Amino acid sequence: MAISDNNTGVHVLLISYPSQGHINPLLQLGKRLAAHPGVRCTLAVTRFVLAHSNTPSTGAVHVVAFSDGCDLRGYDEAGDEATFLARLESSGSATLDALLVAEAALGRPVRAVVYDSFLTWVPRVARRRGAACAAFFTQACAVNVAFAHAWAGRVELPVVEGTTGNKALLPGLPEAGLEPGDFPTFLTKPDGGCRAYLDLVLQQCRGFEEADHVLINSFYELEPKEAEYMASQWGAKTVGPTVPSAYLDNRLPDDVSYGFHLYTPMTAESKAWLDARPANSVVYVSFGSLATPSAHQMADVADGLRNSGKPFLWVVRASETPKLPQGFTDEVKGGRGLVVTWSPQLEVLAHPAVGCFVTHCGWNSTMEALGIGVPMIAMPQWSDQPTNAKYIQDFWRVGVKLRPDAEGVVRKEEVERCVREVMEGELSEEYRKNATSFSDKAKKAMSEGGSSDSNIVEFLAKIRLNE
Protein backbone atom coordinates (compact mmCIF):
# COMPACT_ATOMS: atom_id res chain seq x y z
CA MET A 1 0.00 0.00 0.00
CA ALA A 2 1.57 3.28 -1.06
CA ILE A 3 1.93 6.18 1.35
CA SER A 4 -0.36 9.08 0.57
CA ASP A 5 0.95 12.65 0.72
CA ASN A 6 -2.55 14.04 1.11
CA ASN A 7 -2.44 16.35 4.13
CA THR A 8 -6.19 16.69 4.44
CA GLY A 9 -8.42 14.65 6.72
CA VAL A 10 -7.56 13.22 10.12
CA HIS A 11 -3.98 12.84 11.30
CA VAL A 12 -3.33 10.20 13.97
CA LEU A 13 0.05 9.93 15.66
CA LEU A 14 0.94 6.62 17.33
CA ILE A 15 3.79 6.57 19.85
CA SER A 16 5.28 3.33 21.16
CA TYR A 17 7.22 2.07 24.13
CA PRO A 18 10.68 1.17 22.73
CA SER A 19 10.60 -2.61 22.47
CA GLN A 20 9.76 -4.81 19.51
CA GLY A 21 6.81 -6.44 21.27
CA HIS A 22 5.20 -3.05 21.80
CA ILE A 23 6.13 -1.36 18.52
CA ASN A 24 4.70 -3.89 16.07
CA PRO A 25 1.18 -4.14 17.55
CA LEU A 26 0.88 -0.36 17.46
CA LEU A 27 2.19 -0.28 13.90
CA GLN A 28 -0.38 -2.90 12.86
CA LEU A 29 -3.15 -0.80 14.40
CA GLY A 30 -1.78 2.15 12.46
CA LYS A 31 -2.01 0.18 9.22
CA ARG A 32 -5.66 -0.53 9.97
CA LEU A 33 -6.40 3.13 10.67
CA ALA A 34 -4.51 4.33 7.59
CA ALA A 35 -6.56 2.03 5.37
CA HIS A 36 -9.58 4.28 5.92
CA PRO A 37 -10.08 7.22 3.51
CA GLY A 38 -8.85 10.56 4.75
CA VAL A 39 -6.71 9.15 7.57
CA ARG A 40 -3.00 9.88 7.81
CA CYS A 41 -1.05 7.80 10.34
CA THR A 42 2.39 8.51 11.73
CA LEU A 43 4.26 6.11 14.03
CA ALA A 44 6.81 7.60 16.43
CA VAL A 45 9.59 5.27 17.60
CA THR A 46 12.79 6.12 19.43
CA ARG A 47 15.86 7.24 17.53
CA PHE A 48 17.77 4.21 18.78
CA VAL A 49 15.08 1.77 17.58
CA LEU A 50 14.86 3.42 14.17
CA ALA A 51 18.64 3.36 13.74
CA HIS A 52 18.94 -0.31 14.70
CA SER A 53 15.93 -1.86 12.97
CA ASN A 54 16.26 -3.93 9.84
CA THR A 55 14.87 -1.63 7.11
CA PRO A 56 11.36 -1.15 8.49
CA SER A 57 8.48 -1.74 6.08
CA THR A 58 5.50 0.14 7.41
CA GLY A 59 3.06 0.24 4.51
CA ALA A 60 0.82 3.29 4.62
CA VAL A 61 2.16 4.44 7.99
CA HIS A 62 4.72 7.24 8.10
CA VAL A 63 7.55 6.87 10.61
CA VAL A 64 9.23 9.58 12.69
CA ALA A 65 11.65 9.46 15.61
CA PHE A 66 11.48 10.78 19.15
CA SER A 67 14.09 10.58 21.89
CA ASP A 68 14.09 8.45 25.01
CA GLY A 69 17.29 10.09 26.20
CA CYS A 70 19.27 7.00 25.20
CA ASP A 71 19.77 7.65 21.49
CA LEU A 72 23.17 5.97 21.11
CA ARG A 73 22.94 2.69 23.03
CA GLY A 74 19.29 2.38 24.01
CA TYR A 75 18.48 0.85 27.40
CA ASP A 76 22.14 0.02 28.08
CA GLU A 77 22.92 3.73 28.04
CA ALA A 78 20.71 4.27 31.09
CA GLY A 79 22.15 1.44 33.16
CA ASP A 80 19.02 0.54 35.11
CA GLU A 81 15.26 0.47 34.72
CA ALA A 82 14.43 3.48 36.87
CA THR A 83 16.95 5.70 35.08
CA PHE A 84 15.73 4.54 31.68
CA LEU A 85 12.08 5.22 32.48
CA ALA A 86 12.93 8.66 33.89
CA ARG A 87 14.87 9.57 30.75
CA LEU A 88 12.08 8.22 28.57
CA GLU A 89 9.57 10.53 30.22
CA SER A 90 11.81 13.60 30.25
CA SER A 91 13.20 13.38 26.71
CA GLY A 92 10.08 11.75 25.33
CA SER A 93 7.82 14.55 26.53
CA ALA A 94 10.04 17.23 25.03
CA THR A 95 10.52 15.57 21.66
CA LEU A 96 6.86 14.52 21.35
CA ASP A 97 5.86 18.12 21.96
CA ALA A 98 8.30 19.23 19.26
CA LEU A 99 6.87 16.64 16.86
CA LEU A 100 3.32 17.87 17.39
CA VAL A 101 4.40 21.46 16.80
CA ALA A 102 6.32 20.48 13.65
CA GLU A 103 3.41 18.51 12.17
CA ALA A 104 1.07 21.46 12.74
CA ALA A 105 3.55 23.81 11.07
CA LEU A 106 3.56 21.52 8.02
CA GLY A 107 -0.21 21.85 7.73
CA ARG A 108 -1.08 18.43 9.10
CA PRO A 109 -1.93 18.93 12.78
CA VAL A 110 -2.36 15.78 14.83
CA ARG A 111 -6.00 15.21 15.76
CA ALA A 112 -5.35 12.26 18.09
CA VAL A 113 -2.38 10.56 19.73
CA VAL A 114 -2.62 6.80 20.26
CA TYR A 115 -0.04 5.96 22.89
CA ASP A 116 1.33 2.80 24.44
CA SER A 117 -0.24 2.59 27.89
CA PHE A 118 3.24 2.47 29.47
CA LEU A 119 3.81 6.08 28.35
CA THR A 120 1.61 7.66 30.98
CA TRP A 121 3.00 11.15 30.33
CA VAL A 122 1.63 11.37 26.78
CA PRO A 123 -1.88 12.74 27.58
CA ARG A 124 -0.36 15.78 29.26
CA VAL A 125 1.65 16.61 26.14
CA ALA A 126 -1.12 15.76 23.67
CA ARG A 127 -3.72 17.94 25.34
CA ARG A 128 -1.32 20.85 25.50
CA ARG A 129 -1.33 20.77 21.70
CA GLY A 130 -5.06 20.23 21.32
CA ALA A 131 -4.98 16.53 20.44
CA ALA A 132 -7.24 13.83 21.82
CA CYS A 133 -5.50 10.80 23.28
CA ALA A 134 -6.16 7.07 23.20
CA ALA A 135 -4.38 4.61 25.50
CA PHE A 136 -3.41 1.39 23.70
CA PHE A 137 -2.95 -1.59 26.01
CA THR A 138 -0.77 -4.30 24.48
CA GLN A 139 -1.73 -6.98 27.04
CA ALA A 140 -4.72 -9.31 27.25
CA CYS A 141 -7.95 -7.99 28.72
CA ALA A 142 -7.52 -10.43 31.63
CA VAL A 143 -4.10 -9.04 32.46
CA ASN A 144 -5.36 -5.48 32.26
CA VAL A 145 -8.22 -6.33 34.62
CA ALA A 146 -5.80 -7.94 37.10
CA PHE A 147 -3.54 -4.88 37.05
CA ALA A 148 -6.55 -2.58 37.44
CA HIS A 149 -7.70 -4.43 40.56
CA ALA A 150 -4.18 -4.18 42.01
CA TRP A 151 -4.02 -0.49 41.10
CA ALA A 152 -7.33 0.10 42.89
CA GLY A 153 -6.15 -1.76 45.99
CA ARG A 154 -8.56 -4.67 45.59
CA VAL A 155 -5.65 -7.13 45.37
CA GLU A 156 -3.17 -7.21 48.24
CA LEU A 157 0.46 -7.46 47.13
CA PRO A 158 2.21 -9.74 46.98
CA VAL A 159 -0.28 -12.29 45.74
CA VAL A 160 1.25 -15.35 47.39
CA GLU A 161 2.66 -17.57 44.67
CA GLY A 162 2.78 -21.32 45.00
CA THR A 163 -0.37 -21.76 47.05
CA THR A 164 -3.38 -23.70 45.85
CA GLY A 165 -6.98 -23.72 46.90
CA ASN A 166 -6.72 -19.98 47.47
CA LYS A 167 -8.29 -18.68 44.29
CA ALA A 168 -8.95 -15.01 43.77
CA LEU A 169 -12.48 -14.21 42.63
CA LEU A 170 -12.47 -10.77 41.05
CA PRO A 171 -14.98 -8.90 38.87
CA GLY A 172 -14.19 -9.21 35.19
CA LEU A 173 -12.22 -12.43 35.57
CA PRO A 174 -13.42 -16.04 35.16
CA GLU A 175 -15.84 -17.35 37.76
CA ALA A 176 -13.50 -20.28 38.31
CA GLY A 177 -11.00 -17.77 39.67
CA LEU A 178 -7.24 -17.47 39.40
CA GLU A 179 -4.77 -19.13 41.71
CA PRO A 180 -1.91 -16.94 42.95
CA GLY A 181 0.54 -18.43 40.48
CA ASP A 182 -1.74 -17.45 37.60
CA PHE A 183 -1.26 -13.72 38.19
CA PRO A 184 1.42 -11.65 36.44
CA THR A 185 4.76 -11.99 38.20
CA PHE A 186 4.83 -8.27 39.01
CA LEU A 187 1.96 -8.98 41.41
CA THR A 188 3.31 -12.22 42.88
CA LYS A 189 6.89 -10.99 43.28
CA PRO A 190 6.66 -7.19 43.56
CA ASP A 191 10.04 -6.96 45.26
CA GLY A 192 11.67 -9.92 43.55
CA GLY A 193 12.16 -8.16 40.25
CA CYS A 194 12.34 -4.50 39.40
CA ARG A 195 10.19 -2.14 41.44
CA ALA A 196 10.28 0.36 38.58
CA TYR A 197 8.46 -2.09 36.30
CA LEU A 198 5.85 -2.88 38.94
CA ASP A 199 5.17 0.84 39.18
CA LEU A 200 5.06 1.01 35.38
CA VAL A 201 2.43 -1.71 34.92
CA LEU A 202 0.28 -0.28 37.69
CA GLN A 203 0.67 3.35 36.66
CA GLN A 204 -0.46 2.46 33.13
CA CYS A 205 -3.94 2.04 34.64
CA ARG A 206 -4.10 5.82 34.81
CA GLY A 207 -4.91 5.57 31.13
CA PHE A 208 -8.30 4.09 31.98
CA GLU A 209 -9.26 7.40 33.57
CA GLU A 210 -7.07 9.96 31.80
CA ALA A 211 -7.34 8.91 28.15
CA ASP A 212 -10.23 9.95 25.93
CA HIS A 213 -10.31 6.44 24.44
CA VAL A 214 -9.09 3.02 25.63
CA LEU A 215 -8.05 0.44 23.02
CA ILE A 216 -7.09 -3.17 23.78
CA ASN A 217 -4.99 -5.58 21.73
CA SER A 218 -7.44 -8.48 21.95
CA PHE A 219 -10.74 -9.49 20.41
CA TYR A 220 -14.12 -9.80 22.05
CA GLU A 221 -14.74 -13.44 21.11
CA LEU A 222 -11.52 -14.48 22.87
CA GLU A 223 -12.23 -12.74 26.19
CA PRO A 224 -15.93 -11.81 26.26
CA LYS A 225 -16.34 -11.48 30.03
CA GLU A 226 -13.12 -9.54 30.46
CA ALA A 227 -13.85 -7.29 27.47
CA GLU A 228 -17.36 -6.54 28.71
CA TYR A 229 -16.02 -5.62 32.14
CA MET A 230 -13.46 -3.25 30.64
CA ALA A 231 -16.12 -1.71 28.40
CA SER A 232 -18.47 -1.17 31.34
CA GLN A 233 -15.79 0.38 33.53
CA TRP A 234 -13.77 2.45 31.08
CA GLY A 235 -15.45 2.29 27.67
CA ALA A 236 -12.60 0.10 26.43
CA LYS A 237 -12.71 -1.30 22.90
CA THR A 238 -10.96 -4.40 21.58
CA VAL A 239 -9.14 -3.76 18.28
CA GLY A 240 -7.08 -6.94 17.79
CA PRO A 241 -5.52 -9.22 16.95
CA THR A 242 -2.84 -6.80 15.71
CA VAL A 243 -1.41 -9.42 13.37
CA PRO A 244 -0.59 -8.70 9.70
CA SER A 245 -3.68 -8.84 7.53
CA ALA A 246 -2.34 -11.67 5.36
CA TYR A 247 -2.88 -14.04 8.30
CA LEU A 248 -6.36 -12.76 9.15
CA ASP A 249 -8.80 -11.01 6.81
CA ASN A 250 -6.33 -10.31 3.98
CA ARG A 251 -7.87 -6.87 3.36
CA LEU A 252 -4.64 -4.84 3.45
CA PRO A 253 -2.54 -5.31 0.31
CA ASP A 254 1.04 -6.40 0.98
CA ASP A 255 0.56 -6.53 4.76
CA VAL A 256 2.42 -9.81 5.16
CA SER A 257 4.79 -9.06 8.04
CA TYR A 258 5.52 -6.75 10.93
CA GLY A 259 7.44 -3.61 10.10
CA PHE A 260 10.20 -3.64 12.71
CA HIS A 261 12.71 -6.45 13.23
CA LEU A 262 15.46 -6.06 15.79
CA TYR A 263 16.79 -9.52 14.87
CA THR A 264 17.49 -10.99 11.44
CA PRO A 265 15.35 -14.09 10.79
CA MET A 266 16.88 -17.18 9.19
CA THR A 267 14.02 -17.34 6.70
CA ALA A 268 15.50 -19.45 3.90
CA GLU A 269 16.90 -22.10 6.25
CA SER A 270 13.68 -22.35 8.24
CA LYS A 271 11.45 -22.63 5.18
CA ALA A 272 13.61 -25.21 3.42
CA TRP A 273 13.72 -27.37 6.54
CA LEU A 274 9.96 -27.14 7.13
CA ASP A 275 9.17 -27.85 3.49
CA ALA A 276 10.80 -31.27 3.90
CA ARG A 277 8.59 -32.25 6.85
CA PRO A 278 5.11 -33.87 6.85
CA ALA A 279 2.01 -31.92 7.85
CA ASN A 280 1.48 -31.33 11.59
CA SER A 281 4.72 -33.11 12.48
CA VAL A 282 6.99 -30.30 13.73
CA VAL A 283 7.28 -28.83 17.22
CA TYR A 284 8.14 -25.13 16.95
CA VAL A 285 9.92 -23.69 20.00
CA SER A 286 10.56 -20.04 20.77
CA PHE A 287 10.84 -18.14 24.04
CA GLY A 288 10.73 -14.70 22.44
CA SER A 289 13.14 -11.79 22.34
CA LEU A 290 13.71 -11.26 26.08
CA ALA A 291 13.61 -14.56 27.99
CA THR A 292 16.92 -15.89 29.34
CA PRO A 293 16.42 -19.47 30.62
CA SER A 294 19.30 -20.99 32.58
CA ALA A 295 21.73 -23.42 30.98
CA HIS A 296 20.20 -26.14 33.17
CA GLN A 297 16.75 -25.32 31.82
CA MET A 298 17.97 -25.23 28.23
CA ALA A 299 19.52 -28.68 28.67
CA ASP A 300 16.24 -30.13 29.92
CA VAL A 301 14.33 -28.59 27.02
CA ALA A 302 16.89 -30.01 24.60
CA ASP A 303 16.69 -33.49 26.11
CA GLY A 304 12.89 -33.39 26.24
CA LEU A 305 12.64 -32.42 22.59
CA ARG A 306 15.15 -35.09 21.60
CA ASN A 307 13.37 -37.78 23.61
CA SER A 308 9.94 -36.89 22.21
CA GLY A 309 10.98 -38.25 18.84
CA LYS A 310 9.30 -35.32 17.08
CA PRO A 311 11.13 -33.07 14.62
CA PHE A 312 11.58 -29.59 16.05
CA LEU A 313 12.51 -26.08 14.98
CA TRP A 314 13.96 -24.20 17.95
CA VAL A 315 14.73 -20.49 18.07
CA VAL A 316 17.72 -19.81 20.30
CA ARG A 317 18.98 -16.23 20.14
CA ALA A 318 22.71 -15.81 19.52
CA SER A 319 23.17 -14.57 23.08
CA GLU A 320 21.61 -17.80 24.40
CA THR A 321 23.31 -20.41 22.19
CA PRO A 322 26.23 -20.96 24.62
CA LYS A 323 23.66 -22.40 27.05
CA LEU A 324 22.83 -25.30 24.72
CA PRO A 325 24.39 -28.68 25.52
CA GLN A 326 27.75 -29.07 23.80
CA GLY A 327 27.36 -30.52 20.31
CA PHE A 328 23.54 -30.43 20.43
CA THR A 329 23.05 -28.25 17.35
CA ASP A 330 25.28 -30.45 15.18
CA GLU A 331 23.78 -33.63 16.60
CA VAL A 332 20.21 -32.78 15.59
CA LYS A 333 21.05 -30.98 12.36
CA GLY A 334 20.95 -34.17 10.37
CA GLY A 335 17.17 -34.15 10.27
CA ARG A 336 15.64 -34.42 13.71
CA GLY A 337 15.88 -30.74 14.53
CA LEU A 338 16.97 -27.30 13.40
CA VAL A 339 18.25 -24.58 15.72
CA VAL A 340 18.10 -21.01 14.39
CA THR A 341 19.01 -17.69 15.99
CA TRP A 342 15.73 -16.08 14.89
CA SER A 343 12.80 -17.12 12.73
CA PRO A 344 10.07 -15.53 10.62
CA GLN A 345 7.56 -16.60 13.26
CA LEU A 346 4.34 -15.88 11.39
CA GLU A 347 5.54 -17.83 8.36
CA VAL A 348 6.64 -20.69 10.58
CA LEU A 349 3.37 -20.89 12.51
CA ALA A 350 1.39 -20.81 9.27
CA HIS A 351 3.48 -23.58 7.68
CA PRO A 352 1.52 -26.84 7.26
CA ALA A 353 4.35 -28.83 8.85
CA VAL A 354 4.00 -27.15 12.25
CA GLY A 355 1.90 -29.13 14.71
CA CYS A 356 2.37 -27.20 17.94
CA PHE A 357 4.15 -24.20 19.45
CA VAL A 358 6.22 -24.35 22.64
CA THR A 359 5.99 -20.74 23.74
CA HIS A 360 6.91 -18.39 26.58
CA CYS A 361 3.33 -17.06 26.26
CA GLY A 362 4.21 -13.49 25.40
CA TRP A 363 0.95 -11.90 24.30
CA ASN A 364 2.06 -11.27 20.72
CA SER A 365 3.15 -14.89 20.27
CA THR A 366 -0.07 -16.09 21.89
CA MET A 367 -2.19 -13.95 19.59
CA GLU A 368 -0.25 -15.13 16.54
CA ALA A 369 -0.79 -18.78 17.42
CA LEU A 370 -4.48 -18.20 18.11
CA GLY A 371 -4.93 -16.18 14.93
CA ILE A 372 -3.30 -18.88 12.82
CA GLY A 373 -4.79 -21.79 14.76
CA VAL A 374 -1.77 -23.57 16.25
CA PRO A 375 -2.04 -25.52 19.57
CA MET A 376 0.41 -24.43 22.26
CA ILE A 377 2.61 -25.78 25.01
CA ALA A 378 2.96 -23.00 27.55
CA MET A 379 6.25 -22.32 29.31
CA PRO A 380 5.73 -18.89 30.91
CA GLN A 381 8.76 -16.98 32.15
CA TRP A 382 7.63 -13.71 33.74
CA SER A 383 5.36 -10.64 33.49
CA ASP A 384 1.91 -11.38 32.03
CA GLN A 385 2.92 -14.82 30.74
CA PRO A 386 1.59 -16.95 33.65
CA THR A 387 -1.88 -15.46 33.13
CA ASN A 388 -1.75 -16.12 29.40
CA ALA A 389 -0.63 -19.70 30.10
CA LYS A 390 -3.58 -20.23 32.45
CA TYR A 391 -5.99 -19.19 29.72
CA ILE A 392 -4.24 -21.33 27.10
CA GLN A 393 -4.65 -24.50 29.16
CA ASP A 394 -7.78 -24.07 31.26
CA PHE A 395 -10.08 -21.51 29.66
CA TRP A 396 -9.38 -21.70 25.93
CA ARG A 397 -8.18 -25.32 26.00
CA VAL A 398 -5.81 -24.89 23.08
CA GLY A 399 -2.89 -26.64 24.75
CA VAL A 400 -1.15 -27.51 28.00
CA LYS A 401 1.13 -25.80 30.50
CA LEU A 402 4.53 -27.22 31.40
CA ARG A 403 4.85 -27.83 35.14
CA PRO A 404 8.15 -26.85 36.79
CA ASP A 405 9.50 -28.81 39.75
CA ALA A 406 10.15 -27.47 43.25
CA GLU A 407 13.32 -25.79 42.01
CA GLY A 408 11.46 -23.97 39.26
CA VAL A 409 12.93 -26.08 36.45
CA VAL A 410 10.82 -27.79 33.79
CA ARG A 411 12.41 -31.23 33.56
CA LYS A 412 13.03 -33.15 30.36
CA GLU A 413 10.38 -35.73 31.24
CA GLU A 414 7.76 -32.98 31.51
CA VAL A 415 8.80 -31.49 28.16
CA GLU A 416 8.54 -34.90 26.51
CA ARG A 417 5.18 -35.63 28.16
CA CYS A 418 3.59 -32.37 27.03
CA VAL A 419 4.92 -32.62 23.49
CA ARG A 420 3.45 -36.08 23.16
CA GLU A 421 0.15 -35.01 24.74
CA VAL A 422 -0.41 -32.11 22.36
CA MET A 423 0.93 -33.82 19.25
CA GLU A 424 -0.57 -37.29 19.62
CA GLY A 425 -2.45 -37.59 22.94
CA GLU A 426 -6.14 -38.31 23.36
CA LEU A 427 -6.90 -34.57 23.59
CA SER A 428 -4.71 -33.51 20.66
CA GLU A 429 -7.66 -33.26 18.28
CA GLU A 430 -9.60 -31.16 20.79
CA TYR A 431 -6.68 -28.76 21.12
CA ARG A 432 -6.41 -28.43 17.35
CA LYS A 433 -10.16 -28.02 16.92
CA ASN A 434 -10.30 -25.29 19.57
CA ALA A 435 -7.29 -23.51 18.08
CA THR A 436 -8.92 -23.58 14.65
CA SER A 437 -12.14 -22.20 16.13
CA PHE A 438 -10.32 -19.24 17.68
CA SER A 439 -8.50 -18.66 14.41
CA ASP A 440 -11.85 -18.41 12.63
CA LYS A 441 -13.13 -16.01 15.29
CA ALA A 442 -10.00 -13.85 15.03
CA LYS A 443 -10.39 -13.58 11.27
CA LYS A 444 -14.05 -12.67 11.65
CA ALA A 445 -13.26 -10.04 14.29
CA MET A 446 -10.92 -8.21 11.92
CA SER A 447 -13.08 -8.65 8.81
CA GLU A 448 -15.44 -5.91 7.69
CA GLY A 449 -18.22 -5.57 10.26
CA GLY A 450 -16.46 -7.81 12.78
CA SER A 451 -16.17 -6.88 16.45
CA SER A 452 -12.69 -5.35 16.29
CA ASP A 453 -13.20 -3.80 12.88
CA SER A 454 -16.40 -2.12 14.08
CA ASN A 455 -14.57 -0.75 17.12
CA ILE A 456 -11.86 0.72 14.89
CA VAL A 457 -14.50 2.35 12.69
CA GLU A 458 -16.26 3.76 15.76
CA PHE A 459 -12.99 5.10 17.16
CA LEU A 460 -12.22 6.92 13.91
CA ALA A 461 -15.73 8.34 13.75
CA LYS A 462 -15.32 9.83 17.22
CA ILE A 463 -11.92 11.27 16.32
CA ARG A 464 -13.39 12.92 13.23
CA LEU A 465 -16.12 14.48 15.39
CA ASN A 466 -13.64 15.49 18.12
CA GLU A 467 -15.55 13.42 20.68
Role assignments for model-derived ranges:
Residues 1-467:
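Glycosyltransferase specificity loop/lid
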